Amino acid sequence: MWLNLREKLQSKTVRIEHPEVYECKFCGSDQIMRYGKKTKQLKQRYYCKACKKTFVIDTITRRMWFDPKVVTMTLDLYYKGVSLRGIQDHLNQIFNVQLNSPQTILNWIKKYEELIGEYVKTLKPTLSGQWQVDEMKVKFKGNWKWLWNVMDRHTRYLLASNITKKREAEDARKILALAKEASKGQKPEKVVTDGLHAYKDAFNKEFFTLRKPRTEHISHIRLAGDMNNNLIERLHGTKRDREKVMRGLKTEETPIVPMQDIYYNYVRPHMSLEGRTPAEKAGVGVEDQNKWLGLVKKSLEASRRPVLDNPN
């Protein structure tokens, strides 16, 4: 499988495109020529015959140490299930990019989780009105904990994820509160959960009101029909597959879980959505073919701050 993936990536990703440059950034002359690439960074360098200076084109990603497509391809490979060392080997063989250690990739994940995470929090997805809530066990340094998820049924948009040590009412309430915050004031018509008693107390504290219309809590899951939790259980299956490659999460503060949610919402196409992402279905998707790069660009534009990828 890895060999097939490598061949596919080789044919698709070795051509790193660069924007056309027509004049020197220093003197404005059109007497410019391509002048190789910056060492290990795969960024196109240009030489001006008029002023004898070399330069690299300025773009929205001008402060990224490595070529943005290399960085975003690395993120994509990781969330498609390739191990850190597998990615390190791929970058070396295909792009001649030599990373000192796999930790560099984790540093990229942390850096871009912060950047992209801040951006997506500002977006308001258009939701269907039915939320599905569930929890699953995950491992942190050999200890089992609980990963909670809330998904909008029809868009498949993942509203919130949270990790807790226990599975009590306050833990259930926390995930519902996070989902309400992410919905930007959109009140669900129904909240579907399993029969865990903690959900009843949590739901009443977060959603109960005397005013109509009221949000309905559906906690008895039937084996068939519109109200079952099969969709979010499929999401858990996806996360378990990713966990096998991650070999257990390392700490609650890891950026891997938030980035996995970003990958699920904004990057990964869904067959049930006719090849669209949940974000596209919810009206907040990225149009770029390279979804990761599109997210980075939009995040940089929104934050107006540089991001460095210096591995040292």
Task: Show where each model-derived region lies.
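C-terminal domain-tail junction helix/linker
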Residues: 245-312
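Short, conserved DNA-binding cores of transcription-related domains
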Residues: 1-54, 58-60
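Short, positively charged, Gly/Tyr-enriched micro-motifs
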Residues: 33, 43-131, 135-141, 155-157
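Short glycine-rich loop/turn motifs
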Residues: 143-149
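RNase H-like two-metal-ion nuclease catalytic core shared by retroviral integrases
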Residues: 219-241
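Active-site beta-loop-alpha junctions of metal-dependent nucleic acid enzymes
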Residues: 64-66, 111, 161-184
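Acidic/histidine-rich, metal-coordinating catalytic segments
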Residues: 187-199
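A short acidic (Asp/Glu
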Residues: 143, 199-205
